[in-house]
Amino acid sequence: MSTASQHLYKRRRLINAAAITISCIAALFGLFFLIWILWTLISKGLPGIDLDLFTKITPPPMQKGGLANAFLGSAIMCLLAIVIGTPVGIAAGTWLAEYGNTSQTSTVVRFVNDILLSAPSIVLGLFVYTLYVMHTGGHFSAFSGALALVFIVLPIVVRTTDEMLRLVPGQMREAALSLGIPQWKMITQVLYRSASAGILTGILLALARISGETAPLLFTAFGNQYWSSNIFQPIASLPLVMNQFASSPYKSWQLLAWSGALVLTVFVLLVSLGARALLLRNKIPNT
């Protein structure tokens, strides 16, 4: 090997070592703060995890209680948002993938959906407040909170359904249509079965996303310190209670806020891991 080649080889090795070192430092830097956040969350939230947390409602200041009404309110609004947003999102994603795939309208719809996907959640909350809450006499309710969350669910489900259906091999469509079955039956019995894992993953990711939303609920659900299951009345939610209690001067409320944050983090982690595992187990071959 000539002197010039040796010099070039050493230079490339030096650059490669420097790049690897910088990459490792950057990864460790991000990992350090992630571990720090998780450790703080566990150390401050774990002491408040007990049976009362899940069975008692939010207490007055300086008294013991739990977050049962907040858990119930969050569950009701998230369930309503998923029930309303999922069928609409799947239908819209199906139209994009199967009926309007090459049309100019589908390009516009995808563009608008991408904008909605990245829109600040507080804007969606203000939109529902103006469109629905103000026109119902200014009544805050779990239903209006669910409507705000629907606008977060929709773009996720639409994007996931569109992409998963387009990943299904074209030979499956041709084989089904060659048997003489109508297109709607081909979509429901062939394409949906093939893309079911990916679509379900999108729904789970949407659930994980809306479970921690606070901003849109400030203008819609408003909150309620009592036990309530009426969807047309103000209702508590875990993110709203956490936001209120974390900024309070009372130690008991702060402990409940940390405990609620820990429970919410574990829930989102489990849902995200479940969605990832489901997608990896049922991955559609890209052919």
From Swiss-Prot:
Major site of localization recorded for this protein: membrane
Keyword Transmembrane helix: yes
Gene Ontology molecular-function annotations: phosphate transmembrane transporter activity
Keywords: Cell inner membrane, Cell membrane, Membrane, Phosphate transport, Transmembrane, Transmembrane helix, Transport
Cellular localisation: Cell inner membrane
Membrane topology (UniProt): Multi-pass membrane protein
Transmembrane intervals: 22-42, 70-90, 115-135, 138-158, 199-219, 255-275
NCBIfam families: 3a0107s02c
Role this protein plays: Part of a binding-protein-dependent transport system for phosphate; probably responsible for the translocation of the substrate across the membrane.
The protein's name in its UniProt record: Phosphate transport system permease protein PstA
Organism (species): Xylella fastidiosa (strain Temecula1 / ATCC 700964)
